[in-house]
């Protein structure tokens, strides 16, 4: 558990994703493990701790998100005039732009993976509720700079908090 939480703070997206999938697996294991923890409420409490961490990750600020519109656009060749014809400075800026664009996309993928896993555990292949339908989800003040899809999700007795959240793209 501790290692997976630490992975969420890695500068490498692949390691952060590994942490996400490890945590998702741990929630599922705890919910299913009625031998070690016979009481379902105790198992849910353990799972809720991980859900809280995943929601905290979603809520955490990501500075490049403020530049989503700019970074989603292609790098304009006409910006070369801003560098007084200095090709070297133009190329440096273009490379920096590409690095930031890649970092934004990687972070989108990590956050979208968390939302996708939540959605699948809330609905997919379940007639009413999914195994995560009774957890609480706190997305307050989150900035969703990526598509969010909770279609067909069943939150059961959950408290779901989106207060203060901003959405660039969402489908409920």
Question: What does each model-identified segment do?
Answer:
Residues 128-172:
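Tandem repeat scaffolds
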Residues 1-137:
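N-terminal capping/linker segments that flank leucine-rich repeat
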């Amino acid at each position: 558990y501790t290692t997976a939480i630490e992975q969420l703070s890695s500068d490498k997206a692949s390691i952060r994703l590994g942490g996400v999938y490890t945590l998702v697996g741990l929630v599922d294991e705890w919910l299913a493990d009625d031998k070690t923890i016979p009481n379902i409420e105790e198992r849910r409490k353990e799972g809720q701790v991980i859900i809280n961490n995943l929601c905290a990750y979603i809520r955490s600020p990501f500075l490049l998100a403020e530049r989503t519109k700019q970074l989603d656009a292609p790098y304009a060749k006409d910006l070369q005039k801003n560098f007084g014809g200095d090709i070297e400075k133009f190329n440096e800026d273009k490379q920096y732009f590409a690095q930031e664009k890649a970092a934004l996309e990687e972070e989108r993928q990590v956050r979208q993976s968390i939302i996708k896993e939540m959605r699948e555990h809330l609905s997919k292949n379940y007639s009413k509720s999914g195994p995560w339908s009774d957890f609480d989800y706190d997305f307050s003040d989150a900035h969703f700079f990526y598509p969010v899809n909770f279609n067909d999700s069943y939150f059961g007795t959950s408290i779901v908090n989106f207060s203060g959240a901003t959405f660039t793209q969402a489908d409920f």
